[in-house]
């Protein structure tokens, strides 16, 4: 009788341990290892047209006039990271680095870029984080490792827009975690 109770206890404890060890890995893979709709070829999202029609016209005009430009850096791990940038309409030392959220990319932040560039007169830099847009990587970093890339993008902004740039970093969701 004691032997049977001991075996049942070991089986129950084994199932509980297996559950609590396996489930976190499954959940992590489901949340971070997903296919990223914000990865790949760059396009201006339809959401901008539907919800921010002025931002769409502005983004199209920057695109057509070749004011919105691409740049790339290599981070400390050797991954190629991408960003868009646009110089302000008038000379300024103010720059906004606008960081996207989970499963988004730099073009998804054009609606905020419109506010900073068109209305406030800032230079803008919109990076693609790991595994997003045209940036390398095989998984989201959830903001923790992205923070190092954002610091590197700040240095790059100084090179693009001039030294002693006053910067604001504006992030949404995962981008705010940087």
Task: Give the role of each language-model region.
Residues 17-73:
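An N-terminal hydrophobic leader/cap segment in hydrolases
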Residues 76-87:
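A short loop-to-beta-strand scaffold at the N-terminal edge of the catalytic core in hydrolase folds
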Residues 93-101:
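Short beta-strand element of the alpha/beta-hydrolase
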Residues 116-136:
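Conserved alpha/beta-hydrolase
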Residues 140-161:
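Alpha/beta-hydrolase active-site loop
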């Amino acid at each position: 009788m004691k032997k049977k109770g001991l075996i049942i206890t070991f089986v129950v404890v084994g199932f509980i341990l297996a559950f609590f060890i396996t489930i976190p890995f499954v959940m992590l893979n489901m949340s971070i290892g997903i296919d990223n709709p914000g990865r790949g070829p760059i396009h201006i999202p339809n959401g901008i047209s539907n919800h921010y029609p002025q931002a769409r016209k502005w983004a199209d005009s920057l695109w057509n006039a070749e004011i919105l430009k691409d740049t790339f850096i290599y981070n400390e791990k050797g991954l190629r990271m991408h960003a868009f940038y646009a110089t302000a309409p008038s000379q300024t030392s103010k720059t906004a680095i606008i960081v996207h959220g989970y499963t988004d990319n730099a073009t998804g932040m054009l609606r905020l870029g419109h506010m900073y560039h068109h209305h406030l007169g800032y230079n803008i830099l919109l990076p693609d984080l790991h595994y997003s847009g045209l940036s390398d990587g095989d998984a989201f970093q959830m903001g923790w490792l992205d923070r190092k890339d954002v610091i590197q993008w700040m240095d790059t902004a100084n090179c693009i827009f001039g030294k002693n740039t006053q910067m604001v970093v504006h992030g949404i969701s995962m981008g705010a975690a940087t």
